[in-house]
Amino acid sequence: MYSFVVRALGIDYGTRRIGLALSDATGLLARPWKTIAVSGGPARVAAALAAEVRALTEEQDGLAAIALGYPRRLNGSPTHQTAAVEAVAAALRLSIEIPVVLQDERLSSREAESELARRHKDWRKRKQLLDAASAAIILQDYLDERARQAARVEGENV
């Protein structure tokens, strides 16, 4: 079993709502957690996220990392939100000591929408759950990538 915390937080940034997701204590599975309403610039958003992180670390077993969705177009070029996410990440890194990783979020909202459409017929319910579900996909991608990297390193050390 694990004797240390490997829990991670996933964030899907939006201009009106931010989706949050949490991993289990083993750092293997992501699940949607909640959506928070936000307004203001990157510093204000980072302050709201830092407050959520502090509350979470007090209530739970702590956090090992934060995976913040990094918006890019399919060809890899920046979107209209890329600079805002970079600014939020920079401000968040200044206010907390937990590593903040920018995680590629291409197609995460579409994947979340598709998954929610299979489970929930009511579009209002889907809309409520979309941001947190997108955050869970971003976080799961981060967790899977981290596991692949660990397996490669372990394979090299054999």
Regions found by a protein language model. Give the residues of each.
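Phosphate- and other anionic-substrate recognition elements at nucleic-acid/protein interfaces
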Residues: Y2-I11, T15-V158
